[in-house]
């Protein structure tokens, strides 16, 4: 099973959803339904243990962390996130902590600078940012933009066409989170609509063949949890 993943020339990024200090299992974008992660009889809700177990199976260059509490304007998991970043300095972490204004990014970066932590990339989610003028978030920041798609109105890409700043794009299909399949037609349409951007995909990946299909339509990496959990349980 692991060998089939290794034959696919696409980067796999482990997705971790944090809630109250634990890794939770995503289901269809409804965050009230999230529960602490268990695989078989094993409790893998400790993010450090989860990453360690995943590294035993295959190499990770990047890990995506969504702080669900911060995204919902609750107490953040920042202290835990800082500990994770220090524990795995060889991994780049994509951090989605509900950043809404440039000052929220600057405060986060300054704290990490004081701790001498640099292995992170900021993720801006369109469900949270207050302005779609990406220039105000600064060219100097390492930024991925998460195009958070929950319904049809979230599929607009007009603001990206106008932007001179071209961050990497994460196509985040929230209703497909938890291994509920991929909307390939939507993915192809958006990628065709924005030819000058690099794309990453999240939401609904279930099988190795999904990775091949995403690679074929122009996706550079895939952010996954369900598929990785299957491998950890095998």
Positions of PLM-derived features:
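Catalytic cores of alpha/beta
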Residues: 93-116, 158-161, 187-195, 199-221
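Catalytic domains of carbohydrate-active enzymes, especially glycoside hydrolases
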Residues: 51-66, 163-169
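A structural motif
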Residues: 58-60, 90, 117-119, 165-167, ...
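Active-site-adjacent beta->alpha loops and helix N-cap segments on the catalytic face
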Residues: 71-86, 97-111, 124-142, 176-192, ...
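Short catalytic helix/loop segments, enriched in acidic residues and glycine
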Residues: 30-52
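Hydrophobic faces of well-ordered beta-strands that scaffold small-molecule active sites
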Residues: 11-18, 63-65, 93-97, 120-124, ...
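Short, Lys/Arg-enriched, disordered terminal segments
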Residues: 1-11, 110-114, 231-234
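Conserved anion-binding
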Residues: 15-38, 102-178
């Amino acid at each position: 099973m692991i060998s089939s993943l290794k034959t696919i020339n696409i980067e796999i990024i482990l997705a971790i959803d944090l809630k109250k200090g634990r890794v939770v299992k995503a289901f269809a974008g409804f965050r009230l339904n999230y529960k602490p992660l268990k695989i078989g009889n094993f409790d893998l809700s400790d993010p450090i243990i989860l990453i360690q177990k995943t590294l035993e199976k295959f190499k990770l260059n990047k890990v995506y962390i969504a702080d669900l509490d911060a995204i919902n304007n609750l107490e953040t998991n920042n202290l835990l996130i800082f500990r994770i970043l220090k524990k795995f300095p060889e991994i780049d972490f994509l951090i989605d902590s509900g950043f809404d204004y440039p000052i929220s990014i600057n405060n986060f970066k300054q704290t990490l600078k004081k701790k001498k932590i640099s292995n992170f990339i900021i993720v801006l989610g369109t469900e949270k940012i207050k302005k779609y003028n990406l220039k105000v978030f600064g060219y100097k920041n390492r930024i991925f933009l998460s195009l958070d798609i929950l319904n049809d109105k979230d599929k607009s890409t007009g603001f990206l066409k106008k932007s001179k700043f071209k961050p990497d794009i994460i196509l985040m299909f929230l209703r497909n989170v938890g291994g509920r399949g991929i909307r390939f037609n939507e993915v192809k349409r958006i990628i065709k609509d924005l030819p000058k951007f690099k794309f990453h995909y999240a939401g609904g990946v279930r099988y190795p063949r999904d990775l091949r299909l995403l690679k074929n339509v122009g996706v550079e990496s895939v952010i996954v949890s369900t598929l990785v959990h299957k491998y950890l349980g095998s």
